C-alpha cells in the first residue's frame, strides 16, 4: 500500500487526487466512495456528514455529500455523473469514522455511475497515486498524516 507523508493510500482503490476522494468498484456495478486519509487529516475530526439522498442524481464535479469539521466545511465532489444508491448511515451518526477508518467503515456513499468505463479512465489507480499525492501535498503545504 502506498504511503505518502504518513497517509495510507490503498493500491486497490482509484483516486480523484484533486478532490481527495477514493473509489472502489463493486461487483454489482455500483461504486463506493469516501474521503482519503489525506482529506480526513487535513479536515481534522469530522463533526457532521450529510449526503445526498438515495435516488438523487449527481453531476460530475458536484457535491454528493457535505462534510464538516471544527475547522472546515466543504463538499465531497464526485468525478463523474452518477446516481446515489446508498448512504452510509453509520457515518451520518458517527462522522469521526471518516477519520478513524476512511477506507472501511468511513465510506460515504455508493453510486451507480452513468458511464463507469469513461469515469474510470479519469481516475488515478492506487499503484500510481504516490507521485500525484506527493505533488498535491507539497502544493497544499500539507505536512502529512499524524502517526
Regions found by a protein language model. Give the residues of each.
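Conserved, structured core segments of small domains
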Residues: 98, 116-119
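Vicinal oxygen chelate
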Residues: 82, 96-99
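Acidic, low-complexity mobile loops and tails
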Residues: 1-60, 105-115, 122-130, 134-147
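Short, Lys/Arg- and Gly-enriched loop/turn segments at beta-strand edges
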Residues: 68-77, 93-97
Amino acid at each position: 500500500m502506498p504511503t505518502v507523508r504518513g497517509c495510507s493510500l490503498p493500491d486497490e482503490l482509484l483516486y480523484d487526487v484533486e478532490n481527495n476522494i477514493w473509489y472502489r468498484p463493486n461487483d454489482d456495478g455500483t461504486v463506493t466512495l469516501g474521503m482519503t486519509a489525506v482529506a480526513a487529516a487535513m479536515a481534522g475530526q469530522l463533526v457532521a456528514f450529510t449526503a445526498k439522498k438515495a435516488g438523487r442524481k449527481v453531476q460530475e464535479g458536484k457535491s454528493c455529500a457535505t462534510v464538516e469539521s471544527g475547522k472546515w466545511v466543504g463538499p465531497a465532489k464526485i468525478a463523474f455523473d452518477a446516481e446515489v444508491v446508498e448512504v452510509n448511515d453509520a457515518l451520518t451518526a458517527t462522522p469521526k469514522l471518516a477519520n478513524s477508518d476512511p477506507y472501511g467503515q468511513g465510506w460515504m456513499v455508493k453510486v451507480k455511475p452513468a458511464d463507469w468505463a469513461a469515469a474510470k479512465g479519469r481516475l488515478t489507480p492506487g499503484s500510481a497515486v504516490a507521485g500525484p499525492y506527493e505533488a498535491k501535498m507539497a502544493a497544499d503545504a500539507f505536512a502529512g498524516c499524524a502517526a
